[in-house]
Amino acid sequence: VASLGKALGLTGGVIASDSNFIQEIKNYDTFVAAAGMNPAYVQTLAQTGNLVQQQLKKLQDNLNYLAQHLQPNPKINFTTNYPSIYLNWDKSNEILLKNKIVITHFNYPSDQKTLNRIVISANHQKEDLDQLVQVLNSFL
């Protein structure tokens, strides 16, 4: 699944897999909507290889930094392989907002559970990550 296209300014995504996996994910609300990619955006992306590599390195550095500083917590779902942190407790959005941290916070139509997701980017500074770590580690 390639979902970083939107992070790079593209207006669509791509899923490349075998047909069994494609059929399986069609059952999930998160994968039923689609948007075609603007060819001009794709061409621009193709011409920015060096910049993309630099940003990917910064993103991976940020993810590794978080992995080193976040304390293990069953309410925090995080891996250095994916630039999002999923939070599994009801008051997380309120607490983060009080600390001036804005997250993705919504419900999918067929899911009663609220999605609380923090998206990590290459543009986050060490100070941003330190603030996030401090707040998340205080939930222990």
For the regions a language model picked out, list residue spans one by one:
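Conserved C-terminal alpha-helix-loop-beta "cap" of PLP-dependent enzymes
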Residues: N64, Q68-F139
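Active-site C-terminal subdomain of aminotransferase-like
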Residues: V1-Q71
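Short, low-complexity, polar/charged sequence segments that are solvent-exposed and flexible
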Residues: S19-I22, A33-A35, L45, T104, ...
